């Protein structure tokens, strides 16, 4: 049975009144109309603005569960938590672990991908820089071994879509080329790479920056490192830049500047969410490392008298980021592009990221502050 939704809709970068027909889980038609035009009989009025649902490239968990728990039920719960909050498509992200734990995690997440709960797997580590390890266990960081890499890719059965790495490590450039040739997106992150090393990695096939600015050397005018190199690569070489635009990882001014320089087609808003997303303050863990969430910011736990620990993932959802950035002055079409069509295009999800005929019927309804009020996934309202 066809359902017709009528109301404001974000289509091709503009909000217009439209009727969106949904049939068997897909968008059957999108028809712009005048507000004064008579409604199709039986159509449902939508209270808010319809927009394509969000695609999160970088998510570790939420709702008290995490993909790093190495438990199938917990992983499914984390995925559904983000679906219900507007990210109906996502990569399930793992962190640095032992080889055995990574293999187990990849196998569990590959099953979830087979079931359609997630759209792939992101390995964040273990081939990262110790000096920029952030919330990764430095004892488990290592140079890439292609035999180990291939074991993980085989365990993923084609579902490993992104790998974050520090290209300056011994064998890092070889890993970039190997991932590219294996159909996996090499992402530069947790790195001390120089400007030249980033350029070399981009030339070898790296096409993504993992949470730009975070876990990278600050931009210095005499010794430019990864940050300006990746910004330049976004403008000239088609690299996509992840931004955790939640106000804790980056200032809103920084986000707006990157959007102005690179444009929304080269920026992907990501949550980097951990199990604490949607839960609140308190103690948690990530990849076996203890952390505490206070005031909505997660940090590694330190001993008495020790300095404050590194930020350890996010506690927001992509929907929260979109609302925040719209309130900070970024236009809704730009914010929505960075949350939906840009990451969908990177992942090759041709039926996501836009309200158009033939797309999977994944949409969000937004209020006047760009907050998500309803979510549809594959033609089904998730609040029904």
Mark where each language-model region is.
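Divalent metal-dependent hydrolysis catalytic cores, especially in the metallo-beta-lactamase
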Residues: 60-62, 76-105, 117-129, 157-170, ...
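Generic structural signal for well-ordered alpha-helices
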Residues: 79, 103-110, 149-150, 176, ...
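Active-site core of metal-dependent hydrolases
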Residues: 154-281, 304
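N-terminal metal-binding scaffold of metallo-dependent hydrolase/deaminase domains
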Residues: 1-38
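Active-site gating loops and adjacent loop-to-helix segments of metal-dependent hydrolytic enzymes
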Residues: 57-60, 80-91, 130-157, 200-216, ...
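Conserved, mostly hydrophobic/aromatic
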Residues: 58, 123, 179, 209, ...
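His/Asp/Glu-enriched, well-ordered alpha-helical/loop segment
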Residues: 228-241, 259-271, 276-357, 363-366
């Amino acid at each position: 049975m066809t359902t017709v939704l009528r109301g404001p809709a974000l289509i091709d970068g503009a909000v217009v009144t439209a009727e969106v027909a949904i049939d068997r889980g897909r968008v059957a038609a999108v028809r712009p109309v005048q507000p004064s035009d008579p409604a199709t009989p039986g159509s449902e009025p939508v209270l808010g603005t319809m927009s394509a649902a969000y695609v999160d490239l970088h998510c570790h968990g939420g709702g008290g569960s995490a993909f790093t728990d190495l438990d199938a039920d917990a992983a499914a719960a984390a995925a559904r938590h983000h679906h219900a909050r507007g990210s109906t498509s996502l990569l399930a992200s793992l962190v640095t672990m032992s080889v055995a734990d990574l293999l187990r995690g990849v196998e569990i997440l590959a099953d979830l991908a087979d079931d359609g709960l997630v759209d792939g797997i992101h390995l964040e580590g273990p081939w990262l820089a110790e000096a920029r390890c952030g919330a990764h266990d430095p004892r488990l960081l290592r140079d890439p071994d292609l035999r180990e890499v291939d074991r993980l890719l085989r365990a993923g059965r084609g579902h490993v879509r992104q790998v974050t790495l520090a290209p300056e490590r011994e064998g890092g450039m070889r890993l970039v080329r190997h991932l590219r040739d294996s159909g996996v997106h090499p992402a530069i992150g947790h790195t001390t790479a120089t400007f030249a090393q980033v350029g070399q990695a981009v030339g070898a096939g790296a096409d993504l920056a993992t949470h730009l600015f975070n876990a990278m050397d600050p931009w210095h005018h005499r010794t430019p490192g990864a940050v300006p190199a990746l910004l330049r690569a976004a403008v000239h070489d088609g690299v996509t830049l992840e931004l955790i635009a939640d106000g804790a990882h980056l200032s809103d001014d920084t986000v707006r500047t990157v959007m102005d320089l690179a444009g929304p087609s080269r920026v992907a808003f990501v949550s980097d969410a951990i199990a604490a997303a949607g839960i609140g303050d308190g103690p948690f863990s990530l990849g076996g490392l203890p952390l505490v969430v206070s005031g909505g910011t997660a940090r590694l736990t330190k001993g008495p008298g020790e300095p404050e620990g590194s930020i350890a993932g996010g506690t927001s959802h992509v929907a929260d980021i979109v609302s925040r950035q719209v309130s900070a002055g970024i236009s809704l079409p730009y914010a929505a592009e960075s949350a939906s069509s840009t990451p969908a295009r990177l992942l090759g999800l041709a039926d996501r990221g836009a309200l158009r005929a033939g797309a999977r019927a994944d949409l969000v309804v937004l209020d006047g502050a760009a907050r998500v009020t309803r979510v549809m996934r594959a033609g089904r309202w998730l609040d029904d």
